[in-house]
């Protein structure tokens, strides 16, 4: 129930990271924040709604109440028991859309986190990380990207269905310092919903057993034994089924792995994420990617979502 109307003129911001989900076998459970960020700045006003988007998606996303950041801000305000008569929402987007890099999770987590910047100015209690993960995952339907965007770094997430409503949970992992991260981003786009249609409704016991073993090994590889990353990123549940819809990414994935680079689809693709103990990709692999339309970006693990009250509104 709304108990407080925010005054006009309050400003808050959030910076939120991109993320890569699955990392091979960790389907809908393992996520990794990446050092590519969107920034959201929101101001309360006396009435109305204005949405301004710069960068990725500026000509493609809705500019009204359907905008994902707007929906997340309003859901966050509802969760903390406050309201705003009007909003100006400014988004500076660097995370590519529909590429498997968690742009929707970043929008939701950023919108929710902005609310913390508002409640800090009225001496109210901000949303905890657990609440941010829960609310963001309710938008997403799974917690892997949302949890990574909230907590930063690598995470293991799960859904507790012992309650009337799903309880989305996550714990952070300490990513091994010897692991280097590379994203290979194509021009091609793919929506998660479209990609999920390609997945079978049932899998064999052998395939399930294979992925369970690799997902368990992946936690060890990410934290203690990066020399095991090649075996730990093997998957038979989702990537083979998605390959037909993104042939260029599938071919580049095979080439990277032939060069002993632990590459996987990033989320539902078509971007790839590569994890390596080497500081650079093999020359042939890097040249192939560049020649075939992939933008290759060396990254680090992204930070947890950062929110701030009372920032200067950009002109």
UniProtKB/Swiss-Prot annotation:
It catalyses: L-homoserine + ATP = O-phospho-L-homoserine + ADP + H(+). Pathway: Amino-acid biosynthesis; L-threonine biosynthesis; L-threonine from L-aspartate: step 4/5. Its EC number is 2.7.1.39. It is an enzyme of class 2 (transferase). The keyword Transferase applies. GO terms for molecular function: ATP binding; homoserine kinase activity. It comes from the Bacteria. Keywords: Amino-acid biosynthesis, ATP-binding, Cytoplasm, Kinase, Nucleotide-binding, Threonine biosynthesis, Transferase. It is found in: Cytoplasm. GO terms for cellular component: cytoplasm. Pfam families: GHMP_kinases_C (PF08544), GHMP_kinases_N (PF00288). The keyword Ligase does not apply. Gene3D superfamilies: 3.30.230.10, GHMP kinase, C-terminal domain (3.30.70.890). HAMAP family: Homoser_kinase. Catalyzes the ATP-dependent phosphorylation of L-homoserine to L-homoserine phosphate. This is Homoserine kinase. It comes from Mycobacterium leprae (strain TN).
């Amino acid at each position: 129930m709304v108990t407080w109307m925010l005054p006009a003129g309050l400003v808050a911001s959030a910076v939120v990271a991109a993320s890569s989900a699955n990392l091979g076998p960790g389907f809908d459970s393992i996520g990794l924040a990446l050092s590519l960020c969107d920034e959201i700045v929101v101001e309360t006003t006396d009435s109305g709604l204005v949405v301004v988007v710069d960068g990725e998606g500026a000509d493609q996303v809705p500019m009204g109440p359907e905008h994902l950041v707007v929906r997340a801000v309003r859901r966050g305000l509802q969760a903390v028991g406050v309201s705003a008569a009007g909003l100006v929402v400014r988004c500076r987007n660097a995370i590519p859309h529909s590429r498997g890099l968690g742009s929707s999770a970043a929008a939701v987590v950023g919108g929710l986190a902005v609310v913390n910047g508002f409640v800090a100015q009225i001496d109210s209690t901000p949303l905890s990380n657990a609440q941010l993960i829960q609310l963001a995952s309710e938008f997403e339907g799974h917690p892997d990207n949302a949890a990574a965007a909230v907590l930063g770094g690598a995470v293991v997430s799960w859904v507790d269905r012992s309650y009337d409503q799903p309880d989305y949970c996550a714990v952070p992992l300490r990513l091994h310092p010897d692991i280097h991260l590379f994203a290979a981003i194509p021009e091609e786009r793919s929506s998660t919903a479209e990609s999920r249609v390609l997945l079978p409704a049932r899998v064999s016991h052998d395939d399930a057993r294979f992925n369970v073993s690799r997902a368990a090994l992946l936690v060890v590889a990410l934290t203690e034994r990066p020399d095991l990353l090649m075996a730990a990123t093997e998957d038979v549940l989702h990537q083979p089924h998605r390959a037909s819809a993104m042939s260029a990414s599938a071919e580049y994935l095979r080439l990277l792995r032939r060069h002993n680079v632990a590459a996987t689809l990033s989320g539902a693709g078509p971007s790839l994420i590569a994890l390596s103990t080497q500081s650079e990709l093999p020359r042939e692999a890097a040249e192939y990617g560049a020649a075939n339309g992939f933008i290759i970006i060396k990254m680090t693990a992204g930070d947890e979502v950062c929110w701030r009250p009372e920032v200067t509104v950009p002109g």
